[in-house]
Regions:
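Juxtamembrane/interface alpha-helical elements of multi-pass membrane proteins
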Residues: 73-187
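Alpha-helical transmembrane segments and their membrane-interface exit regions
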Residues: 51-61, 75-79
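Membrane-helix interfacial "entry" motifs
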Residues: 14, 37, 60-65, 97, ...
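Transmembrane helix-loop junctions in multipass membrane proteins, especially transporters and channels
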Residues: 41, 45, 60-64, 88-96, ...
Length: 268
């Protein structure tokens, strides 16, 4: 299950999405997510899904691979779904069972909030799958560069965010290895209820933390050995430049937002 998480992984390729400027991809990803959160009905979500499917097809990534990345988060999505059912108040009851009354508004909010999380994960996964770590760091740094005049550490923050993001699949892979090693020694992670499974995962934490600190130390030593001193006077092999692909991407995303807003007014 852990190996199915796509967030933080990079899928090498030469598609139009891969060749886009990382700054533009970051901006358009944020705009897409904002557009998804503007959606409040089923046709809008179908439109968001169709747009995402088109982008994934252009990138050369299998859409099923992206869907698999949502599966490990199903418990979080289910938890938020149930939370909305219990705590969102409504005026149109569907049925009552003891102290619990399910309303149409609560069900509506639960479904749409769960869909928001799904699109949030899938949208950001497309960004990391089509953008290398170096490009992602450069893109974040260039976007935050104007803040440096206020002594904002743009390069350091961009580096920290990128390393943290790229460590997600590494730590998940390490967790999977430790889990398999402990299962070979008789550990049981699959039987019992949800609470019992959660308790069984506790022995994974100590070796996982040790591995994480070891990897972080190795990375720090490697950066120091290469005389890394931050972003001051840093040169780049390829300078970032906007191209026609970025213009087409911006126009397509703007069209998506316009259609979402128009559809919301017509059906809202």
């Amino acid at each position: 299950m852990l190996k199915d998480i796509t967030l933080g992984q990079y899928f090498p390729g030469d598609s139009a999405i891969h060749r886009m400027d990382p700054r533009m991809k970051l901006i358009l990803t944020i705009v897409y997510i904002v557009g998804v959160f503007m959606v409040s009905n089923l046709p809008g979500y179908l439109l968001a899904l169709a747009f995402l499917y088109l982008v994934v097809r252009i990138s050369g990534i299998k859409f099923s691979y992206l869907v698999k990345g949502v599966k490990p988060l199903r418990f979080i999505i289910l938890f938020t779904f149930v939370l909305n059912l219990f705590f969102v108040q409504g005026e149109t009851p569907i049925f009552s069972l003891g102290f619990f009354t399910l309303t149409k508004e609560a069900l509506h909010n639960a479904i749409f909030f769960a869909l928001h999380l799904v699109f949030l994960v899938m949208g950001t996964s497309v960004l990391t799958l089509t953008t290398s770590p170096v490009q992602l760091t450069d893109g974040l740094e260039r976007l935050m560069h104007p803040l440096q005049r206020f002594h904002f550490p743009a390069h350091e923050l961009a580096m920290m965010m990128t390393i943290a993001l790229r460590f997600i699949p590494t730590l998940l892979e390490e967790t999977d290895k430790i889990q398999k090693a402990q299962m070979a020694r008789g550990a049981d992670f699959e039987s019992g209820n949800l609470l019992a499974r959660a308790k069984a995962m506790i022995p994974l934490l100590v070796p996982l933390f040790v591995s994480a600190f070891r990897r972080a130390n190795d990375l720090a030593m490697a950066m120091e050995a290469r005389c890394y001193r931050g972003g001051d006077h840093r040169t780049r092999l390829r300078e970032l430049r906007y191209t026609r692909l970025d213009v087409f991407g911006a126009l397509a995303t703007a069209a998506f937002i316009a259609v979402v807003m128009l559809e919301g007014r017509l059906l809202g």
